[in-house]
Amino acid sequence: QRVHRGLGLLGNAMKRILIMGLPGAGKTTLANELRKLLPGAVVWLNADDVRRKFNDWDFSHDGRIRQSMRMRELADRSDADYVICDFVAPLPEMRNNFKPDWTVWVDTIEQGRFEDTNKAFVAPTVYDFRVTEQNAEKWADFIAEHILENRRRPTFDWKKETVQMLGRWQPWHAGHRALFERALAK
């Protein structure tokens, strides 16, 4: 059994995990694997199951907004430690409505099976994980480990002075300046 033990739960507050991407990308399969790995109580909300329960198959812009708010409300009502929600969330507004603690973008296909969704989908610029291959076990292990250790994708404040060193972008600080001044002095 693959259960991650790590640092345990991060405080007492429920954590919302959004698994989003095009239809057919593997969101549901990944959500199913991830729920097995997180400790404590885990609730999994699948968008199709929620739509079925509420008999709401409206995929217009307003219908999708309503669905994102519904997913948020259902997550907020939960007393679980983690709530995993897998839904397309094609627009930033829908992702923001859900207010995830962690966002997983399943980016494994170029186009989904529904043309209207393909046209509406805006690739996210903010996410914690970008899944690029359909290997749910591998990615669930990776994501669970990072969630349990609260390791996030690095972010930078591009308004601050930065420099590219050793092939990666990082904040510029006095130590870097000293290294460059020493190198230039030679």
Regions found by a protein language model. Give the residues of each.
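Hydrophobic anchor at the beta1->P-loop junction of P-loop NTPases
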Residues: 19
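Small-molecule kinase domains that catalyze NTP-dependent phosphoryl transfer to phosphate-bearing small molecules
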Residues: 97, 106-154
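Glycine-rich phosphate-binding loop used to anchor ATP phosphates in small-molecule kinases
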Residues: 62-110
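Nucleotidyltransferase catalytic core that binds NTPs
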Residues: 152-186
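Short, Lys/Arg-enriched N-terminal segments with co-localized hydrophobic residues
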Residues: 1-13
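Conserved substrate/cofactor phosphate-moiety recognition/catalytic segment
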Residues: 32-73
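Conserved lysine of the Walker
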Residues: 27
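The conserved Walker
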Residues: 23
